[in-house]
Amino acid sequence: MKDVAMLAGLAAMVTGGGAAAQDAPPEPGLELLYRSVVTLSPAVEVGETPRGTRRFIPITGGTFEGPEMRGEIMPMGWDWQLDTADGCTQIVADYFLKTDDGVIINVVNSGALCPPRDGKPPVPVRTSPVFEAPLGKYEWLNHGAYVGTLGFDPQATEPSVVITIYKAN
């Protein structure tokens, strides 16, 4: 009987009956998760591949801080980059956060850096991070939708990037 009621409710939503079908979900907003400064070693050129010119940049450390978490970027990881025929650079960074309470979280952050077209201003670099956190205090990271920004600090004294991550609410 429970299954019949659930199917009837689902049918009403699909066919437009009931309040659930008429109410649109609220637009998502963004909440700051953290801002990080990630330090880097010089790029290592791999060379031409069938997909484009490949390089990687070792991640050597850094820090992150936000309202719910803070800690360090562990000195292991890399930023794989691929220059493609359209002039863009595809990036996939794979690295680890270590929170101030000792939890290690994997981050795989991907995006694209593309040159401006037709005299337009440069497009801001946006990334799509995915987290893999152990069960416990930070497991909520495994189930969210996130967007990041990638930039540079002109005052930096060593090679680094500034990555700010937001959670969709």
List each language-model region with its residue ranges.
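Bacterial N-terminal signal peptides that target proteins for export
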Residues: 1-7
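Cleavable N-terminal signal peptides
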Residues: 8-9, 19
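Beta-strand-enriched cores of mature, soluble protein domains
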Residues: 21-169
